[in-house]
């Protein structure tokens, strides 16, 4: 057994309904390399529970009232103060109600019986959202939503990040870390702490924690990893101030993913070098390109608070592959090497995890599971009779046949997230999507006919896309509404490290601007040769959303956990909520909330 004591950390803000894959996966890889003294902490979930505690919400009300009083004493308010006053006033009105009911709301979100009743679920969801809005008012203009976090400081700018790390009035995680995390860490002599940054909005919370740990325990080696770290690694390495509180970065092979592909090996190699007496270097790459996932044991979720996630059932993330088997879309940077796990190993892992953690529910976190892998895994799952239920993400391609969809359903697939992007033939070809409107329609129908809930993602405002072409996508979705459970749509922006960014003229992009003041931005500012203007795109998106809201059932539209289609609640609803979706027995009952007199 190796002697290094290690802590793996997932910082705010992410999905509070399930664990994130990278930590359990890294823990398992480290154990296989002899590092057994490894703890893992989900500070993302902990931060939600800290601020949504009844006692903390009572303090929020005190802070809100005090701030309102201070603003009231001013002779006049400027525009920013007026906006803050409005948010504080709303929070002061809602907080007594929210404080009384937050415990019941969290209980509903963890209860499979209550959560399956739409009215009670939506009532609990409303309390949760309003509680976060009230906390946001306390830290105005910071906005904390489920799975989203925004400050007046941009995570795309190193200078603004540094300012955010000490902004007491803006950064809620300073209090959370000082009150709930640092005292806990002080009692355990960790040698190395690895902070996994998966999403852009985690950069400020992650580095806030790193800086506080550096000040409190300067002898701890602080490592930064995860997908976002890997994506930005060259730019982060050019940021000298980062080295004052981060000792090393261990990055993935060029395969962006929820788990890690090579980053876990690189971290193990760093630990081995440190035990051999070498000083940790600032940047560590995988020593070799990852050609197989055979080196990865099943993820180890031990030590995570699996009963505290805000989900009616425990949904565990798992990956059958890394990367995208297509890897040619011009708008996407997921073009690295694609590697798969052997289907027999997948089934063996799922059987182990299901038995060990007493759950039937799994979220396949692959970027997109290939039709061939779906066929192999479905066949073996059915043969093994594991009786598990799962969600996956797929490309709408010809390989998703009616036969394959039936096989997937028989093996427990209950929900699929489908990246439609556009339903216009020219735009699909321009994007190198590798599909057609006819194939899109057939895939959706095949999945629906097999009993698999279909969730669609699309984009508006692709380079040179006209309003008529964007309308083709909307008309397509409305025509296929019987096969679609819900739709998510966002405005398209060109991202760095994509073919569109490298060869803009090919896609009708006239100018492209990589703002030097935003080196950590994913997106680029562009102007196109034709298509809709930004104002026209925003106007069409509003029209798109109104049309979809009218077309899809209210329960289908709203019952995905705060609009995040990958969540545990989506899979649960697909498995169990159908019998309740038209029930009127609970109408008006809601959460049995205690209303203000």
Residue positions per predicted region:
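A structural motif corresponding to the C-terminal lobe/cap of the Radical SAM core domain
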Residues: 2, 7-14, 21-22, 42-45, ...
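Acidic, low-complexity intrinsically disordered segments
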Residues: 2-347, 355-356
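Flexible loop/turn segments at secondary-structure boundaries
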Residues: 14-17, 47-48, 200-204, 230-232, ...
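Short acidic/polar active-site loop segments enriched in Thr and Asp
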Residues: 36, 191, 359-360, 414, ...
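Radical SAM [4Fe-4S] cluster-binding motif and immediate context
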Residues: 291-453, 475
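C-terminal non-catalytic accessory extensions
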Residues: 566-597
